[in-house]
UniProtKB/Swiss-Prot annotation:
InterPro entries: FAD-bd_PCMH, FAD-bd_PCMH-like_sf, FAD-bd_PCMH_sub1, FAD-bd_PCMH_sub2, MurB, MurB_C, MurB_C_sf, Oxid_FAD_bind_N. The lineage of its organism: Bacteria, Pseudomonadati, Thermodesulfobacteriota, Desulfuromonadia, Geobacterales. One of its GO terms (molecular function) is FAD binding. This is UDP-N-acetylenolpyruvoylglucosamine reductase. Belongs to the MurB family. It comes from Trichlorobacter lovleyi (strain ATCC BAA-1151 / DSM 17278 / SZ). Residues 29-192 form the FAD-binding PCMH-type domain.
Amino acid sequence: MHAGLEHIRDWFKGELLFHEPLARHVSLKVGGPVDLLATPDSREELQQLVTLLDQQQIPRFVLGGGFNLLPSDVGYRGCAISLKQINRLQLDDTVVAIEAGASNQSLARAVAELGLSGIEFLIGIPGSVGGAVRMNAGAHGSDIFSVVKTVTLLDQGQFRELPREQLTYGYRCFEIPDNSVIVAVTLQLSEDSLQAVRSRMEEQLGLRWATQNVKFPNAGSFFKNPPGESAWRLIDQAGLRGFSIGNAQVSEVHTNFLINRGNATAADFRALAAAVKERVKATCGIELEEEVQLLDSGECGQ
């Protein structure tokens, strides 16, 4: 463990968990111990923590909700940062300011009860708002950047609020400076009737359960959809429905979901993902790209 991590307990007010198994915090239920999992109580404590880690060149990453992450079996030599306490919501007419640690589903429900429309699809996407922004999360033709107005980053020790015009984003991606942290986002929503918003949310949940009723631990869609294609269809065409390596398996319900059948390892999932990519390339001539972030044993970044 990095020596500098021990001294954080001298001033840090939030929760600190040393040698914490990542498997407890990742939806795939895999991953070895991280040296330190820190949960700052405020933006200011986050700023102080990130500054110290960077000064001492200690690797770090933002855990988010753990729903789009595949760590290593050996764990992570550095600091994982949870933003779950940085989750405030503020409303100004139809503009919603929400911090990165809030959950997507709680945000979707909160604005729906206010008769605000534009992010109904988030009800079916587990994880945190920061994670949703980082990957430009979306479903059924909608994505979060369709309503993003500004994004606040912690970059080189300073908070920066960037307007939409200065942001670069695309399908399942949002480009941010290396080692910066998404802290908050403002969303431009629109007014609608409470009944209409609730109805669309129920429709989104219905679509999710009809197509993605996967009962085993998973990370959601594992691969991005190639242009004009669906990853699940390509995987199915390659004959991989139900294919497994160790206890990691291609779901028989939705083939773009890789599931943990019980006691799977991160190595099982990495081997399975590699096998899927190889078979799809050989069968369909298309190179799949992971939507899930593969976390090595000590790398910096969100």
